[in-house]
Amino acid sequence: MGNREMEELIPLVNRLQDAFSALGQSCLLELPQIAVVGGQSAGKSSVLENFVGRDFLPRGSGIVTRRPLVLQLVTSKAEYAEFLHCKGKKFTDFDEVRLEIEAETDRVTGMNKGISSIPINLRVYSPHVLNLTLIDLPGITKVPVGDQPPDIEYQIREMIMQFITRENCLILAVTPANTDLANSDALKLAKEVDPQGLRTIGVITKLDLMDEGTDARDVLENKLLPLRRGYVGVVNRSQKDIDGKKDIKAAMLAERKFFLSHPAYRHIADRMGTPHLQKVLNQQLTNHIRDTLPNFRNKLQGQLLSIEHEVEAYKNFKPEDPTRKTKALLQMVQQFAVDFEKRIEGSGDQVDTLELSGGAKINRIFHERFPFEIVKMEFNEKELRREISYAIKNIHGIRTGLFTPDMAFEAIVKKQIVKLKGPSLKSVDLVIQELINTVKKCTKKLANFPRLCEETERIVANHIREREGKTKDQVLLLIDIQVSYINTNHEDFIGFANAQQRSSQVHKKTTVGNQGTNLPPSRQIVIRKGWLTISNIGIMKGGSKGYWFVLTAESLSWYKDDEEKEKKYMLPLDNLKVRDVEKSFMSSKHIFALFNTEQRNVYKDYRFLELACDSQEDVDSWKASLLRAGVYPDKSVAENDENGQAENFSMDPQLERQVETIRNLVDSYMSIINKCIRDLIPKTIMHLMINNVKDFINSELLAQLYSSEDQNTLMEESAEQAQRRDEMLRMYQALKEALGIIGDISTATVSTPAPPPVDDSWIQHSRRSPPPSPTTQRRPTLSAPLARPTSGRGPAPAIPSPGPHSGAPPVPFRPGPLPPFPSSSDSFGAPPQVPSRPTRAPPSVPSRRPPPSPTRPTIIRPLESSLLD
């Protein structure tokens, strides 16, 4: 390859790519595309070939490039080419690449000059290129030939615009030196899509083919028709050179010789030629790379900060240290104990806001689930009265009793107390499950050491199972203690006298636990507050709507909002029951309903009041609160109602009074027992289970771990953890290295600032006014006689320059003395113009040029507007 400037950029980009590859990421460094735009046979393909440094594009007269060629350069160790339409086939001979381009063009467009917008995609892999995209476009033409359509100009224009409108596309506006620059379609198109001129570089070709005695010095010096980034002159190989197999390297030497030997260009030879064009383009690539570095730097610094804390822990990791495993084991067990205690006892720091902790769930078991299970088992009033009746009758036997037998009371009470074993044991099971779940969550931090995690779970779970048996034995013992002696002398027990008084009441409301006879004087104590949705209100009446509900021992009220200022309704709890409602597949809400046992409307004209919650846990919690207020669940009774009604109907008034008396006594005594059990069971579980497990973890877990397995086995890291640690450390180093490389690139490269804007309005003017002739915009060489101006065809050629650095643009030809030059508002920094002197002939060519002097600054003065129109 012949692009030395590109080869200097390759190491920088490769270092950046390598740094990102070490991170396992792709470096999204999208370098600009380079598109060549110009008329037919302007030398576009030759410019592109010279930039790449390879001969691979078709050549000839007329329209040769008839389809866009999208050339992707890919950095690779091997050098070959691939076509998208020939997948899998590698071209190592670039003459074959040229033939394939011609064949593929003819396949789509035909053999008779047809064109197509379907691009040919070619990839060239080489160690001497950057990852760039170059685009060779068809030449701009106006008259169709051969098979070309009538709107050939429009089609080619649209084809070109598809590529050059992209912001990351550098535009090489190619114009031959032997044509009129003011009519350059390439410059006009570039101006449309790049009005600021930041992406456009003018390229003047065929300087060696200009008419004898003319040159393009004023154009190349950016004086005549200025562009923001100026012009670069190049000399491409002729068809004769190509046929003679003249390579690009030899062509560049000939080009260099041309500019150094030509009298009009030798003073700007260092800014002319293909090498300088390569330098300009590669400088734009360098600018682009430097512009992308801040984003890369910010991205890498963010990643570095995110892993820095974790890497700090790994930095002190010394696998060869024999004390490391002992220290790590001790720290792990201590951390596990702290985490377990925080999850059970609660903690103010690092509070989980997404789910309840183990301690919070156990609290719900103690104060919501356990009371709910107790109340659920004793709500069957009809069954209880039947049992009391049977007990009284069986105690009396064949005799007719005159008094209420206290043995019937004891028998019924003992049977009811024994029923408490089920809810009590169930609460133990629920607490055990939560403890095990808490242990599993705490051992997640031990996952880096699989054997340690497994052994910790096993040892703690075994201890919990051991305590399970002792806790359940103690719970059963508490129940048996209550059964063993019925204390009718308890201060809260109503006694027979009060029971008989209460039996005279027709309507009695059953109470729950300690909400029975020992209620406070005010029954307006709030049991629960919260948001609920009344879901069974029809759409015509407003539809489902959320309200703020307040539950007391006497009523259920709801308000518009939680400020409790606007009360919507108050529902008394008398004769109310609660039941579940099947969840609708159309709704995500969980619903329960309240209804009246006497078939009365609960709310307005509704028999049921359906209330919706967001979760089943909320439903269970509200049902437990309603139970505390005396609202029982509805449960279909499977007894034979007819027999029960017959027996009730057959009871004599005395037996009925005795049943009612014992029922009141049982209710009073069971409220005492329930209060006691609800208080003692949580305390028993807390003492024998939860506190014991905490003490075991703090005092004995470490010793059992040491005795269970070898320490080295316990502290053996998982393969995943070792890999993660290595990856973290590697990524940390790679990030630091990448940041260093970015810093090196920023230091080693220099951004070239964009040139100041110029007045390029001549591109628009050229559409409205007649353009100057090609001959008048080319100046004569210093050895040629002064050309005669053509009247009415624009400005005359400029006078010869007295020195290499004092050239002036053309001067208007006017007889007689000239008036002083008016000051122009155009400010594009052109050198001053030299007035003509009619009193004497123009100076001849000096035989010796004065050497360029740095002490002679060039005075810059605006051009006359008349020279541009």
Swiss-Prot record:
Cleavable signal peptide: none
Name of the protein this chain belongs to: Dynamin-3
Domain GED: 659-750
Source organism per UniProt: Homo sapiens
EC primary class: hydrolase
Annotated spans, G4 motif: 205-208
Ranges for region G2 motif: 64-66
Known EC number: 3.6.5.5
CDD domains associated with the record: DLP_1, PH_dynamin
Region listing for G5 motif, in residue ranges: 235-238
